[in-house]
Amino acid sequence: QAVAELMPYSGGLKRNIVQCLQDYDIPLLLSHTVVDIQGKDRVEGVTIAKVDTKGKPIPGTEITYPCDTLLLSCGLIPENELSAGCGVELSTVTGGPVVNESLETNVEGVFACGNVLHVHDLVDYVSGEAKEAGARAAQYIKGGKTDSLKENIVQIIPENGVRYTVPSTIRLSHMKNTQTVRFRVGREYRNVKVCIYADDQLLRSLPKKTMAPGEMENIILMDKDMVKKDGTDVARIRIAVEE
């Protein structure tokens, strides 16, 4: 009868909202939560209420829906017990491993991809990531170990509305001609720009009509982006949302 979302925006894909809710005239109630469940041996009704900016139910806004089923969708967290057990560093934002341009973790020879790395929207992204991780793992096996102390490493820094990036670092000697960087934002945005900085120099400004936490974004970095005008290597790539 209805979908209640605690946040003031949807965490799902727009096309899923259209195909699963709007096409069937199912209302999406943003900033709402379940406050009561009726029934003894089984569910007979559910009461929801609007919440304030702190997520607390607002008295007087309750709506009761007679129903026999309550489905809870509590989000996804990457399963990484195996990763943690072998010493892989995990991101406090995604719950998945922190990886470099090769999708390699801090434990040499251990690679990560798919939903164990970060939750994906589309299987196309998962497939592409898996292909890249497999190719990089094979390359590692054939090439042997690398001396990370001698690597020129560029840090990728999420700023101003960007919650995280994958990868988090780029080893310049392992970078291809281009590098895809995936990220998510922390809230809904309209008519903004995604700005890419090499240290303090603006490289590109990409206009975005809409951005939402439920939809993964990506940018493409080029090898020339990693070199400053004076010929020295860039130390940091910063990705930020600017209004």
Task: Describe the residue ranges of each PLM region.
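Short, aromatic- and glycine-rich surface loops/edge beta-strands on solvent-exposed regions
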Residues: 181, 194-196, 224-243
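A Rossmann-like FAD-binding core segment of flavoenzymes
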Residues: 1-81, 177-210
